């Protein structure tokens, strides 16, 4: 281009009317603050052909959360199945656009631009929420995790900068909207927070499950990617996570009100190097078991023996990241089952 005298922006010239038209349209979209979302450093705007506000409102609510009046889970599922919502006047075949813009020096760069029917977008979003579905504590106020809450699971909430990685946030938004694979950085950031805090929240467990359902890996098979505890699973990493949860339950029962458990000291090493750590945990378990009364002792011993029967005599020396994900899900599922049982007993 330079040989023709085209330098800087002149190597891709834009006509005056075209420049006016797209900047005026973009400014109009950005002025509607209710339908503009910021994900990391990416500003996301969406619109439908025909410009009816209901498409923008529904699209933003489905993708980012917001609980707009008149929008329900049933509406989302109907559109995902290609069925119209006559009461809302929404056509699933209406062309719909999503634009993600990010700053680039003194300019803007297009992080992603998606065009599809509105129904196809709703199917991608609905599929994402179904992958994310996992048993949750009763105190959680969300029935599903909106994008902003999902990204919050990847950051240290005690740090000064609570913003997620901009590139990861944009890639995650694009994956959900397009139905593509989740970025590896989403899983890595989630696992990093679990290891740093030794705490598996509902959101983090949901991310692990959704990630490996969309990005399959033999070390974290489908049998462990269930909504609730899969007692029939013989997966070693998943079973080790379950075993760790029961060991912790025995310790808490033997020492009511303790401030720290084996999770605070051994969780990370147990997930990464089980062959080295589980013999130590078993010795602690024997000491804790002796403090329990007869009925409690039998109850926990049966669970431990059943899990050890699945595992056999030898444990893995090291586990991959995917196996650690299966371990985390096993621990989470087993722990949630214990808490659910306690709540049911308290409500009787």
Model-derived regions: residue spans:
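Extended alpha-helical scaffolding segments
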Residues: 1-348
